[in-house]
């Protein structure tokens, strides 16, 4: 154990026994249970280390030394080879550190169950593979020698705990597991034991790993899986808070999956155990102040709450924030706040800077927005979360959350049902009434809201997948010609107050008409599908409709600003029947149309007819335009598309080079004037792009050349060497990957490769 030995105070702190309830003595349990004996039971305590990316210092030594010696036959031979005094010392510690448990034994004579007190320690288990490790603990698989049951044993070094002053974390986790023993959704602690050097926690074994591995395996989870696991997580968190424990480090790595694919919360080393307050109720139930502030800086960067970073305090509502982050990650496949390092991640958390991925379900988006709020007073309570429309089919009262079988794990795919706006639910059901209160954005029942909440009907309008919320409101009424209006919209993407001023100047054109968009169910939609007949080949399915259309000017001479702006695009929305067919002649370029559909897709169509070698041939370029500059543009509603960075154009192909060329083409043609204004500049760019695209396609269809040999010439592969037949000399072609390197670095690389070639030549001669 090193130069320092454990004192009596250290042993007293690390060796508090687990005290079972009176009900545990009368129950029949096939697993061993703790025994009430404080005099001789030396119970260890667990330490959950900080995984990668978590706050706190890393281990100074390797955690492999925490793993106990596998006590199989080779291990026994190793024990036999020890010095007799050392072997006797180990046996004494195995006897002293063993846990006294009550075990049900069947009397062979009478056939009755009798309770026997037995000792179980390190010699009663066979240790196997390592399941995981942390900064000062390791988790190994252990098998009971008598029953063959598998357990997860957490091993902690006593010396390291005392030297790094981590004993308090072990004590906290031990007390938390004591209070939570038998709670659904919480890892079960059976008993603890120790030897001279280590503490051991005998825990429930989770064969399916952690929740993060499940998300990484499938990339994301569909709505059914997300609802199933989210309901279990929030119910387990509710049980924690009812017992007076705040986890403070909920994340996918600390959520494990048992043999039945049910969630189990673990890692209570940083938990906060609240003191019990005097009860003011008639039933005498314990009361805990869940809003008591704590200044301990604990948690994980991607899931830490903003009040801990901004105000240096946290309470039980940090668990609700972490739940919102996990719910987002289930559907998106990544945390909402993720950056290159922890500092940048903290900056995103403090600014509530996150964006929803394309096609994110509307109902889940509504819930996440009300959880990831800067002010904890504005976040939903657990009761309001359970009453949300997303959990409308989940019954948290009858325990079916834990009894239902898990669904088939499938990744999330964008579908029309998920993109539908939230419907106003019936007022008759009590549970649905709670959902309406939650949908209206009410905060905690105990704390007043700082801003008025929108009604359910207004929320339904805001959720429409059209250009903006203000634009949706104007869809329901015809605009007056010659009038000017300004509409203010409050953004719901985070808790900061953003106002987007949308100015619409109507033109005196008879063809300008507002399509009638109904905010009710699709069955009451009065629109005729014939209006989408022309664009039917571009729509994904029967549920997709064209909501907005704009004819974009083609000549950069006529563009003062980007046509993506509100003033230029959102102005002239048209009915598809009012648009002349894009195939009508309009010069070399036919037309460029900008569309928005109810599934949140923004499409740009370019039609032209080449007059050269591909005469009478029509080229169609289809882009999916995702506009994210929420602070300035907000053209696409926050219910549709939000992506970090500047405007990005996606094409329906897998060629990255084509994508970049298209971006340059559209960006230069729409947002800036060319240095030399020429009506042919756009045409030349387009012709050059089409020509290069056809050439790239031909090259792609050709079979790649087979290299003559695997030898390196000048340290470079054969494909980098060109041989001129006339000269018969070898010319080194500089690889494309080295184009960005400086000439000095390339010279050094070439010199080194030349030396390698000489060495290879000498080897061949020998």
UniProtKB/Swiss-Prot annotation:
Residues 1-52, 476-529, 725-745 are annotated as: Disordered. The PIF-pocket is a small lobe in the catalytic domain required by the enzyme for the binding to the hydrophobic motif of its substrates. It is an allosteric regulatory site that can accommodate small compounds acting as allosteric inhibitors. Signal peptide: none annotated. One of its GO terms (cellular component) is cytosol. PANTHER family: 3-PHOSPHOINOSITIDE-DEPENDENT PROTEIN KINASE 1-RELATED, SERINE/THREONINE-PROTEIN KINASE. Residues 38-52, 476-495, 735-745 have a biased composition (Polar residues). The modification Phosphoserine is found at residues 294, 296. InterPro entries: Kinase-like_dom_sf, PDPK1, Prot_kinase_dom, Protein_kinase_ATP_BS, Ser/Thr_kinase_AS, Ser_Thr_kinase_AGC. It catalyses: L-seryl-[protein] + ATP = O-phospho-L-seryl-[protein] + ADP + H(+); L-threonyl-[protein] + ATP = O-phospho-L-threonyl-[protein] + ADP + H(+). The lineage of its organism: Eukaryota, Fungi, Dikarya, Ascomycota, Saccharomycotina. It comes from the Eukaryota. Its EC number is 2.7.11.1. Activates YPK1 by phosphorylating of a threonine residue. The active site is at 249 (proton acceptor). ATP binds at residues 135-137, 154, 204-206, 210, 253, 267. It comes from Saccharomyces cerevisiae (strain ATCC 204508 / S288c). Gene3D superfamilies: Phosphorylase Kinase, domain 1, Transferase(Phosphotransferase) domain 1. Residues 156-201 are annotated as: PIF-pocket. One of its GO terms (biological process) is intracellular signal transduction. Transmembrane segments: none annotated. Keywords: ATP-binding, Kinase, Nucleotide-binding, Phosphoprotein, Serine/threonine-protein kinase, Transferase. This is Serine/threonine-protein kinase PKH1.
């Amino acid at each position: 154990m090193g130069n320092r030995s454990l004192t009596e105070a250290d042993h007293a702190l690390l060796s508090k026994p687990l005290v079972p309830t009176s009900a545990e003595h009368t129950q029949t349990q096939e697993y061993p249970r703790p025994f009430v004996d404080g005099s001789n039971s030396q119970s260890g305590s667990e330490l959950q280390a900080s995984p990668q990316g978590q706050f706190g210092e890393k281990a100074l030594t390797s955690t492999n030394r925490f793993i106990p010696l596998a006590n199989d036959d080779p291990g026994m031979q190793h024990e036999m080879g020890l010095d007799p005094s050392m072997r006797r010392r180990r046996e004494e510690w195995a006897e002293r550190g063993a846990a006294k448990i009550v075990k049900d034994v069947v009397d062979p004579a009478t056939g009755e169950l009798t309770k026997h007190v037995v000792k179980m320690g390190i010699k009663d288990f066979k240790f196997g593979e390592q399941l995981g490790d942390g900064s000062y603990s390791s988790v190994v698989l252990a098998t009971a020698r008598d029953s063959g049951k598998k357990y997860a044993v957490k091993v902690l070094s006593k010396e390291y705990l005392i030297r790094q002053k981590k004993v308090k974390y072990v004590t906290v986790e031990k007390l938390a597991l004591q209070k939570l023993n038998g709670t659904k959704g919480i890892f079960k602690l059976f008993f603890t034991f120790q030897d001279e050097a280590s503490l051991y926690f005998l825990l429930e074994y989770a064969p399916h790993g952690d929740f993060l591995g499940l998300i990484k395996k499938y990339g994301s989870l569909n709505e059914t899986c997300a609802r199933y696991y989210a309901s279990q997580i929030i119910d387990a968190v509710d049980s924690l808070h009812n017992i007076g424990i705040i986890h403070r480090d909920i994340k996918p790595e600390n959520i494990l999956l048992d043999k039945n694919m049910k969630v189990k919360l673990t890692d209570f080393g940083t938990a906060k155990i609240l003191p019990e307050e005097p009860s003011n109720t008639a039933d005498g139930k314990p009361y805990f102040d869940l809003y008591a502030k704590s200044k301990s800086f604990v948690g994980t960067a991607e899931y830490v709450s903003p009040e801990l970073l901004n105000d240096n305090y946290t309470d039980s509502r940090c668990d609700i924030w972490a739940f919102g982050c996990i719910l987002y990650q289930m559907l998106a496949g990544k945390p909402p706040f993720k950056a290159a390092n922890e500092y940048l991640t903290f900056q995103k958390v403090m600014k509530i800077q996150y964006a929803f991925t394309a096609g994110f379900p509307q109902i889940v988006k509504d819930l996440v927005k009300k959880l990831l709020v800067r002010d904890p007073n504005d976040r939903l309570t657990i009761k309001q979360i359970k009453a949300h429309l997303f959990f409308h089919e989940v019954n948290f009262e009858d325990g079916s959350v834990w009894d239902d079988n898990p669904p088939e794990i499938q990744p999330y795919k964008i579908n029309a049902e998920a993109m539908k706006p939230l419907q106003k639910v019936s007022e008759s059901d009590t549970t649905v009434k709670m959902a309406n209160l939650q949908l209206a954005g009410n905060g905690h029942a105990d704390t007043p809201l700082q801003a008025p909440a929108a009604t359910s009907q207004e929320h339904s309008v805001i959720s429409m997948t059209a250009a903006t919320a203000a634009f949706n409101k104007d869809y329901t009424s015809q605009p007056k010609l010659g009038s000017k209006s300004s509409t203010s919209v409050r953004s719901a993407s985070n808790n900061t107050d953003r106002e987007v001023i949308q100015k619409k100047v109507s033109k005196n054109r008879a063809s300008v008409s507002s399509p009638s968009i109904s905010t009710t169910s699709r069955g009451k939609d009065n629109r005729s599908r014939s209006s989408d007949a022309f664009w039917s080949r571009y729509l994904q399915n029967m549920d997709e409709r064209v909501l907005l259309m704009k004819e974009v000017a083609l000549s950069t001479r006529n563009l003062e600003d980007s046509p993506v702006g509100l003033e230029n695009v959102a102005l002239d929305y048209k009915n598809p029947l009012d648009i002349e067919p894009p195939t009508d002649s309009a010069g070399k370029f036919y037309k460029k149309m900008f569309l928005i559909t109810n599934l949140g897709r923004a499409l740009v169509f370019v039609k032209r007819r080449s007059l050269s070698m591909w005469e009478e041939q029509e080229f169609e370029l289809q882009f999916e335009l995702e506009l994210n500059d929420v602070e300035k543009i907000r053209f696409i509603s926050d219910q549709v598309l939000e992506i970090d960075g500047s405007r990005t154009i996606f094409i329906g192909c897998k060629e990255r080079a084509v994508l970049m060329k298209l971006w340059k083409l559209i960006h230069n043609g729409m947002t800036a004037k060319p240095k030399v204004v020429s009506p042919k500049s756009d045409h030349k760019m387009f012709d050059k792009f089409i020509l290069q695209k056809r050439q790239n396609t031909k090259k792609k269809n050709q079979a790649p050349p087979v290299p003559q040999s695997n030898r390196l010439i000048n340290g470079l592969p054969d494909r980098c060497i060109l041989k001129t037949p006339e000269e018969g000399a070898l010319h080194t072609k500089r690889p494309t990957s080295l184009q960005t390197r400086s000439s000095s670095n390339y010279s050094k690389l070439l010199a080194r490769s030349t030396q390698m070639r000489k060495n290879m030549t000498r080897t061949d001669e020998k």
